[in-house]
Design a protein with these regions (language model features):
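Catalytic cores and adjacent flexible loops of soluble metabolic enzymes
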Residues: 1-289
Length: 289
C-alpha cells in the first residue's frame, strides 16, 4: 500500500489583511481535513521595487493585469509578525505549518520558528542561491514548477543535493490563475518522480477537485490547493481558491481514490471468493432410462 498523500491548504493572500481571518483559516483547514497549512513569507520591499515604470506593471494576461507588482505584494503578503502565532495555532490544531520563503531573510525568520519544510514557489525556481540557502537547513524541500523548463528543474534539484539535501518533492504546477484543466498535464507527475529521482505531487490552480483526484492515480505524494474561508471576502487569490465545504469533499474524494488504488495482487478478496462460490460449474450428464 502506498503512503498517504499529504493534503496542503495554501493560505496565500486569503487572510485579506486580517490576522483573525488568518487564524480562522488555519482552524478551518483542519476542519476540512488538511494535513498541513502553508504560508508565504515575503514583504513587498524584499522582492520588488515601488516603481511606476512599465516593467513593474503586471501585464501577463492574468487576473492581476494592470496592477503594480509592489501594490499586489503589499496587499497579499502575510505580515511577518503574524507567523509565530499562526505556527502556534497550527500546532494546536495538529497541523504541519510551513512556508515559501522568497529571500534569505525570510529563511532566517522561518528558521527561528523551526519551520519544518521549505517550499520554493514557482517564480523562484531559478533563484539558485535561495534554493541552496533553504536546502542547507536540511529540512524537506518542495519545488513548484509552474514556469520551469526541464533544465530549470534539474538545476534546482541539483542545488538541493549540492547542499546534502536529498529530501526533495517536485510539484507539477501550471502558473495560470485559474489554470485550464487541459493544461494541467498531470501525467508529468509520474515522469517528474522517475526523471529526477524525487517524490512528486501537484500544486493545483485548476478549479474543482478533478485534478487532485487524478494526481493521486499518478503517484502524487503531496497535493496543494489554495484555501479560503469564503470567496466573498475577496482578495487577490479568491477566484481560484477552494472554500471549506468543497475542500473537505476534495479530501474525502482523494482518500477514496487512494483507497481504490489498493495494491497489485491477484489474490481474491473475501467478497471475490464469495462471488466465486456462486459461479457456474461444468456439468456432465447421461440419458436416464
Amino acid at each position: 500500500m502506498r503512503d498517504k498523500c499529504m493534503i496542503v491548504a495554501e493560505m496565500s493572500a486569503n487572510h485579506n489583511g486580517k490576522k483573525e481571518t488568518a487564524i480562522e483559516t488555519v482552524r478551518a483547514a483542519k476542519r476540512a481535513g488538511a494535513d498541513a497549512v502553508k504560508l508565504q513569507t515575503y514583504r513587498a520591499d524584499t522582492i520588488t521595487l515601488r516603481c511606476d515604470k512599465p516593467d513593474f506593471i503586471i501585464n501577463e494576461g492574468s487576473i492581476w493585469d494592470g496592477q503594480y507588482f509592489y501594490d499586489l505584494y503589499e496587499q497579499a503578503y502575510t505580515p511577518w509578525e503574524w507567523h509565530e502565532e499562526l505556527f502556534h495555532v497550527a500546532k494546536e490544531e495538529g497541523l504541519i505549518c510551513f512556508s515559501s520563503p522568497f529571500d534569505k531573510t525570510a529563511v532566517d525568520m522561518l528558521e527561528a520558528l523551526d519551520c519544518p519544510v521549505y517550499k520554493i514557489a514557482s517564480f523562484e525556481i531559478t533563484d539558485i542561491p535561495l534554493i541552496e540557502y533553504a536546502a542547507s537547513k536540511h529540512k524537506p524541500m518542495v519545488l513548484a514548477t509552474g514556469i520551469a523548463t526541464e533544465e530549470d528543474i534539474q538545476l534546482a534539484v541539483e542545488a538541493c543535493r549540492r547542499m546534502g539535501n536529498n529530501d526533495i518533492t517536485v510539484l507539477k504546477c501550471t502558473s495560470s490563475y485559474p489554470a485550464p484543466v487541459e493544461e494541467a498535464n498531470l501525467c508529468m507527475i509520474r515522469d517528474l518522480a522517475e526523471r529526477f529521482q524525487v517524490k512528486s505531487g501537484l500544486s493545483d490552480h485548476t478549479l474543482g477537485s478533478v485534478s487532485p483526484i487524478v494526481a493521486v492515480t499518478q503517484g502524487a505524494s503531496m497535493i496543494e490547493k489554495h484555501f479560503i474561508l469564503n470567496r466573498s471576502i475577496g482578495g487577490p487569490d479568491c477566484s481560484f481558491s477552494m472554500e471549506e465545504k468543497d475542500f473537505a469533499q476534495m479530501v474525502k474524494d482523494v482518500l477514496m481514490a487512494e483507497l481504490s488504488l489498493g495494491k497489485t495482487t491477484y489474490e481474491l478478496t473475501e467478497k471475490m471468493r464469495g462471488s466465486r462460490s456462486a459461479s457456474r460449474s461444468p456439468v456432465s450428464y447421461t440419458h436416464l432410462r
